Curated annotation (Swiss-Prot):
Pathway: Carbohydrate degradation; L-arabinose degradation via L-ribulose; D-xylulose 5-phosphate from L-arabinose (bacterial route): step 1/3. Its EC number is 5.3.1.4. GO terms for molecular function: L-arabinose isomerase activity; manganese ion binding. The keyword Metal-binding applies. This is L-arabinose isomerase. It comes from the Bacteria. The lineage of its organism: Bacteria, Pseudomonadati, Pseudomonadota, Gammaproteobacteria, Vibrionales.
Amino acid sequence: MKIFNDKQVWFVTGSQHLYGPQVLESVAQNSEEIIAGLNSSDDISVSIANKGTVKTPDEILAVCRAANNDPDCIGLMLWMHTFSPAKMWIAGLTQLNKPFLHLHTQFNAALPWDEIDMDFMNLNQSAHGCREFGFIGTRLNIERKVVVGHWQEPQVHRDIDDWCRAAIGVNAGQHLKVARFGDNMRQVAVTEGNKVSAQIQFGYEVNAYGLGELSDVVNSISDADVNHQLDKYACMYEMSPDLFNDSDLKKLMAQEARLELGMESFLKSVGAGAFTNTFENLTGLTNLPGLATQRLMAKGFGYGGEGDWKTAAMTHIMKVMGQGKPGGTSFMEDYTYNFGEKGQVLGAHMLEVCPTIAAAKPRLEVHRHTIGCRCDIPRLIFSGQSGEALNVSIIDLGDRFRMIVNVIDTVTPPQSLPHLPVAHALWEPQPNLNIAAAAWIHAGGAHHAVYSQAVTLPMLADYAEILGIEMVVIDNSTNLRQFKQELRNNGVYYRLG
């Protein structure tokens, strides 16, 4: 069973009647075998459905319209087995509103040198059939992914899956609702943005709800459900026995359990897969949710602190994209620096870092929260797993959205942090702190980000390409002067476009 077993990619083979029924029968058989091979690959996370060989403009238009109207279809994979005159594709492609991947492969890997004849040549024409098809994609100015290689190669499977996961992310965004509890943190700029523009570009809705509505649901959670939740905490996390033996501490734990259950119930009732809150708007709640928010993120909900709905949405989308991959995804903030031979960033937030990124079993503790609401709040404490990761920021530039991605290397802290009462990750930005921070600032990247060790750079590149949004990357190849010029060039391109 595939990871995303409720969605499909439609495989459509291009040809024409010119070649006769015998060749078309071979085309159909070869397509069946390729699809079976791709579906048998553990590297491909979405089922691929055979939608046959299209040979006329009407057949092409029909399959494109059918794809548009099928909610389970996240995109098309198109392959030209033979020559398929590309004017036949104009009507279909101009009406297609799903993304497509152009698979540039052929059925056989090697040429049968001793047997090759013109029948073989006329059957296996993807080398020039795909070029004809490629022209019309370019002529129509359609963004698409082109995967080149033999269909049995593992790298081809991985390239296909990157695109599949990007298409899944686009689909997730089109069905996402973000719930806002309270407004943005006062006077903060980068967390603002045009919600109408975001819905047009990404598909997700951003809706505000009163804290009174939320607190009513939170307060309705029964003591029995709270106690059951506390039992779960005891099984899942390291903790001091005092959390349950001390009556005051247990009361705080019960408050947090009630917040988690109430928030989850409310979010599900309004169909929201992501949410925001802010420490400046907590009327009716006992405290800023800590453990509650961390656990909701671990369940797949997106989160953005201080009203940051763009990061909340992207956190959920990337959690969906990364399903089944090693590593986790979390809301994150660049918090403080460690300047030295290798400049490092200690990332954290006041409370809300997702335990899916933890290097070891998280520890549940209660500490004083000193920003906004001053009270004791339960939270999970851990360090992030070492290894390569990404920080991703989506910003609203007025005329467009920009995605900024920094490739980073997460490392184990050289010493314990006994007095730091929050979850955290320590990383070394690529290519180094000086260039990465300067590039991030020049690009306008937010102080919040989506941190992920599950989602890859190719997935995000495909995601940005499908949506037609700007993407800039900061990694080991970044040269600051060239990066600044790229930003200038992009500004001209998107304004003229």
